[in-house]
Amino acid sequence: MNSGINYVCVATEMKLYLPYLKMLLPELVILGLNEKWEGFITKYKLLKHYLSLDEIDDDTLICFIDAYDVLPTKNIIDFERNYKEFIKHHPDVKMIVGYDVVDNVVHEHLCQDIFGTVDNVRLNSGQFIGSAKNIKEVINYILDNTSNFQTDQIELTKYANTFKKEVYIDVNHDFFYVKSRPLKQVVLPTTGLNSAGAGAGAGAGAGSGPAFIHANGNGFLNDFLLKEHGIYISDKERIFHFIENVKSVLKKIIIYDLIYIKKHLRLFYNLLLNNFKINGHTINEYDKDLPLRQELQ
């Protein structure tokens, strides 16, 4: 595919839908293959190094996508044109990111509590597009100003709240269609997408719809592959996908539970510091260097 966009992902191994992503997007650059995963910060560290390469000019368009659960749609042929048309109308935007949709109300509440929101809208960090210069500035700022990197989604949400004009959340699914359906099939909806085209909802001009679909939260893209690209996944591979995704879901539950617990423990601790009094003084007034305080910062 001839494109002025550099497509990049981070993956330590070739599994799940990554082989199909590479098949459908041969120019895809895979960072971190066969390397050790060191947590979510690995994504930004590897991407930062990639953006520093001599062959990457400031004006190079960079589209980052998650490796294991994202695939291109047929609309990708209009992706570059739609992006440039959008930026023409929104020059302050440094990055377009996905908008995460969840069917389950409880799931949505937990996601908002863990990852945070931007004006009550929840972005998804698993796909974004912008110039190399702008992406580099965003990533460098996050890495330079984050002492405790939790997940790329949490840190990007913090950035978006600080610099709201710089991050556009694709609420109309003009560029990315993101759906959180753990262990369920994700396909493009037959209705509800902006049929007027990419960016039309924000006055950017005509297009054809989202260029990528993201089965966020360990969803399946088997039905999408068959319907959109005529690619059939065997029963054996489907079983493998199911097992891999179940394992990943369990890992995420542990990781996100720890984040959730620590967040609420921090709130309780601060409440205790400022409200529990001894001899008329709060604990906060007695000692500002408590070990637990330092641990929860």
Tell what function each PLM region has.
Residues 71-115:
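Conserved donor-nucleotide/metal-binding helix-loop-beta segment in metal-dependent transferases, i.e.
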Residues 180-199, 203-296:
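C-terminal catalytic/acceptor-binding lobe
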Residues 1-61, 250-253, 257, 263-293:
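N-terminal anchoring/stem segment of glycosyltransferases
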Residues 121-199, 203-230:
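Catalytic core and acceptor-binding pocket of nucleotide-sugar-dependent glycosyltransferases
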Residues 17-26, 110-112, 225-231:
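Short, aromatic/basic amphipathic alpha-helical patches
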Residues 36-65, 71-75, 123, 151-160:
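A conserved donor-nucleotide-binding helix/loop in the catalytic core
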Residues 29-37, 95-100, 151-155, 170-176, ...:
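A generic structural motif
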Residues 18, 44, 69, 73-76, ...:
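Generic preference for well-ordered alpha-helical elements
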